[in-house]
């Protein structure tokens, strides 16, 4: 093969155009692994239909397309001159000047027809009117974004927008359009739709509903670049709801949805790719919104009604903080403010954590710590207020080398911090609502992990308060090895608490609080006791005697198990 044959082959196969596109992508993206990057690009070339479908900016991300040409635009021409055949009659395409950017028509149910460029210049919201509240709902594929978004919209009378559905409808209605045919291939392969196209569709939809008081947007943004574009072209959201769910659970839900609905992007290959994209993008996206104080994280690996209850509490707190509180916060006892069975992960202060440690899937970021935690001795010590739990826990912890954890104390400690979680708890309590038990469970888990290596076990006082709390503890951490119920009459507990209240000068307020707490305890404790009796983990101890007598009974119960 002579030189001209080689040049003719390169030109006929559009190899210069392919190489230029790959080089531009490498220079703009600067990947850590260029080999893997090139393999991914070549796979996309196949999916697009060959080298002739590739343009100079095919592998340049949207936000990087404004770079000036190298060497005044001459490098491209010199590159082509060196590889093109010398025969002037050879029919090759010249690219001395880039072709014009086509303006794609945007169609809608209201027969709106404008170019993408004009859409970008529009003010989405009327500046003379109050802007609607914007809630973004994000999470992995299959995390329940659509379900929860619809519930939020229905509860608050907001408009619901599914970005995925917007794109699917557009693809269906514009199937003959080359641009949307390419986007359909991208989505079917599990990749993200082009950023500017997606933003344009969202803006168009928002302009069709100017009178809404609030809007819930499901499935956007997917990465930080999209978040920045949304804020730049539309607005800063009022709240971002992040649904964290275990990776395996996401796969199971997607498989089930594929069987039921047959969505093209729920095929196995696309599902795997979407999960990879989510894992790569979620941590920095969550951290970005967290630094702006906009995001609340929820454990979505639960019943959808329980998840929605927690979301409602957060939305009320963040967007409607002026609702009248049923009780004054000074009347509230933090240890009694747990809402059994309702679990919320409000997130943590991630400022001091690496991105790869962020719990974006609802999985245990402590890794091996959780396995060690499940091997530890765990004892629940139940008893009403005034039964002597606190006193006995201190003595037992000293004797056996256990770590004593009080759920009420953990909650009070959290309230003294300045974390986003503490602010949410304080808002909930000031309104007189129940603190979701997921908050308490997360506090317990954090405290237990922090004590690993320095303890022989955990003695947990005041938990669980209802059966669902115990079930959730068992699922996420592990079942206790022993549950001790300190059996004490209401009269004895009342007398002890009254003596304590007199020493602290609480007077009649103390008496009112005592009656309320005892009533709540008796109402909740019976099913819990029955639950652990059936699991043969329960030991009852008579707590009517002196502290010494009760302590001996407790030691006997513990020694019989360990």
UniProtKB/Swiss-Prot annotation:
SUPFAM superfamilies (alphabetical): Dimerization-anchoring domain of cAMP-dependent PK regulatory subunit (SSF47391), P-loop containing nucleoside triphosphate hydrolases (SSF52540)
Function: Nucleoside monophosphate (NMP) kinase that catalyzes the reversible transfer of the terminal phosphate group between nucleoside triphosphates and monophosphates. Active on AMP and dAMP with ATP as a donor. When GTP is used as phosphate donor, the enzyme phosphorylates AMP, CMP, and to a small extent dCMP. Also displays broad nucleoside diphosphate kinase activity.
GO molecular function: adenylate kinase activity; ATP binding; nucleoside diphosphate kinase activity
Organism: Mus musculus (Mouse)
EC number: 2.7.4.3, 2.7.4.6
Region annotated LID 2, chain positions: 499-509
HAMAP family recorded: Adenylate_kinase_Adk
Protein name: Adenylate kinase isoenzyme 5
